[in-house]
Amino acid sequence: TQRKLAVPSYQEFYAGHMHQEIAQFIGKDQKDYRVVSIGMHPAITQYNGFYTLDAYVGNYPLEYKHEFRKVMIAELDKSPFYRDYFDHLGGSRCYLFVEKLMYNAMMTKDHNIVIEELALDSAQLKKMGGHYVFSALEIQNSQDIGLKLLKVFEEPDSAWRIYLYEVS
């Protein structure tokens, strides 16, 4: 069966087998490290047993929101929409917003998009306990911002192509 663009089945969306492969590749107990997602909902990694710094959550400390904002402050500065959304409207959505994606957390492998220049503060991400970035898109300036590409994961039964970056 051919699936429709950006309309994955339940199995394709959560991609359990692929996330098991990622966990095995990392080779540590999932409780011992934290991840963030780009271009895909953090609920996917949470569902698969990963501990995330990003989430869709109703209540969390305002201090945490301010610390998380520092990770992507330069990215928010590129987009008045995202800045306003994160600061004033989308309090429950503690996501890494990327200006190029324009509110799309469904960057399935059908999309042929790359992130040329991500403005991410990896030192702040690391300070918050972030160890890995699960990105649905290639980040071309990854080395410049302190991210090391470890491996690209893709499977026929997954909606995603996941670029696994380590925060260095």
Model-derived segments and spans:
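Extracytoplasmic/lumenal acceptor-recognition loop(s) of multi-pass membrane glycoenzymes
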Residues: 4, 39-112
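Short amphipathic alpha-helical surface micro-motifs
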Residues: 16-18, 34-36, 114-117, 144-148
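A Trp-anchored, charged/polar loop motif used as the substrate-binding/catalytic surface
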Residues: 21-24, 111-123
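Generic alpha-helical secondary structure signal
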Residues: 16-20, 66, 123
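Aromatic/acidic, Gly/Pro-rich catalytic loop(s) in extracytoplasmic/lumenal soluble domains
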Residues: 116-168
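Generic structural signal for short, flexible, solvent-exposed coil/loop and linker residues
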Residues: 11, 39-41, 114, 122, ...
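Extracytoplasmic
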Residues: 1-57
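Generic preference for hydrophobic/aromatic residues in regular secondary structure cores
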Residues: 35, 93-97, 147-149, 165
